[in-house]
Amino acid sequence: MRIRRILYFYGNLPNTYTANVLRRLAFSCWHTHQLPPTISATRSCFSAMAEMQDSHNEMELYSPNPEVRGMTCLNRDAFDKTIHVPVIKIKKEIINRLMKSLKHRLIQRPSLKRVIEDPKDDVNKLVLLDPYKVKSIDSFDESDHVLFKQFDVNPQVSQYELQLTYENFKCEEILRAVLPKGQDVTSGFSRVGHIAHMNLRDHQLPYKNVIGQVILDKNPGITSVVNKTNTIDSTYRNFQMEVLAGEENMITKVKENYVTYEFDFSKVYWNPRLGTEHNRIIGFLKARDVLFDVFAGVGPFAVPAAKKNCTVYANDLNPESYKWLLHNCKLNKVEKRVQAFNTDGRDFIKTTIKKELLKYADMPSAEEKPSLHIAMNLPALAVEFLDAFKNLLEEEPCNSFILPTIHCYSFSKDDDPLQDVKARAESFLGTTLEDCSMHLVRNVAPNKEMVCISFKLPSSVLFQRLSDTGEPESKRPRTAEAFPLPHVQQSRNS
């Protein structure tokens, strides 16, 4: 259970290099059952002192006032708080030369100036120091004292009364102070262009408007915060969402793997955490290869494949996804290499894919044939569509035929998700998959994995002949009339 929680945390990190390294480490530990290593202020008064007295720990010092607990309508003024921090006086003409050397001892707070005017001194300025790194003159090391002596600085540590405001608190500090004690605090979200997409839990819903406004305030570039509701569109599998804060404009622009996409986030599916997986599949393709994308969405497989000079046949049942797929092909200047379709995935397999497979089968054997790939990225249902490939080319010869490689995605809540997905794929195909590749994509929830299974479509499935009863000839039941039972002598012990 602890490992699954770690996977859930690392699997939901944004797509950065560091996050991807952490994900790979977590997934590796999952397989070996090992845990990874623990990984506008205003001044009010100024007074001299010899040493700073020990106070609360850092979390308490930088926690907003307890009165904000349970707030359901954001009141920024309620976060004003006075704290005491150490300061030293430094002459104005040398302060810039000293700041770099003192950087590691300065106070670190959002929107807080660390050098301020001293109203009683025209010659010096006050430098705000970190109260947990500087307690007294003894907190400075030898190199600091050499520097002070060089610039004729008297490093007298004094106490300064600093008023923190809402702007000086971090997002997680505010939310931790507002939400009830002992409950999970979320400040994480998926960023989709200017939209912050959150998945709030039930106990957080009474505070959703405060959470949304804080996320909006603390993240430059975010102009809209939305929350996924529990309602799912049964036809297109889209989650409904509500706007918690900011504008209601859901048409956004994102960049993924050097490709630009535009779409209406409220009407299509887009997951910014899948960029690495999209790139992994595109890595299997080379120029002149062919990609069939059964559940194409707005084009995260189709567009980069076309940019790689592949021929692409992309389909999606959702009319909005189809519209934005066409738009993104034009936006990235690959519309001539992509044929888009707006139909059911099963129909796409039985018509378009079948037709194109036959076309490539008729290519002269002397001509270099491309590799064929079929992407099926609808994890909730894609495995169930695999039976559409059974006897797809029932009446066609299979000699010298190019067998396509299928990349099929699925969710699993099983203790062994890789084996579970493989077994279900084999069940819908009606055959065993001796040579397949299993890839753990990401942890969707503490007990839910997203898996990709890749395999060459077996010729026994693609060219399976059916009898008049609609069953494979090799699996027709042997009736007593056709095969009389031999006489078996009864054993004495029976």
Curated annotation (Swiss-Prot):
Annotated positions binding S-adenosyl-L-methionine: H278, D316, L317, D344, G345, N377
First and last residues of the transit peptide: 1-32
Group of enzyme by EC: transferase
Keywords annotated in UniProt: Cytoplasm, Methyltransferase, Mitochondrion, Nucleus, S-adenosyl-L-methionine, Transferase, Transit peptide, tRNA processing
Pfam families reported in the protein's UniProt record: TRM5-TYW2_MTfase, TYW2_N_2
One Gene Ontology molecular-function label: tRNA (guanine(37)-N1)-methyltransferase activity
Family: Belongs to the class I-like SAM-binding methyltransferase superfamily. TRM5/TYW2 family.
PANTHER family linked: TRNA (GUANINE(37)-N1)-METHYLTRANSFERASE, TRNA METHYLTRANSFERASE
Protein name from the UniProt record: tRNA (guanine(37)-N(1))-methyltransferase
Lineage, uppermost ranks: Eukaryota, Metazoa, Chordata, Craniata, Vertebrata
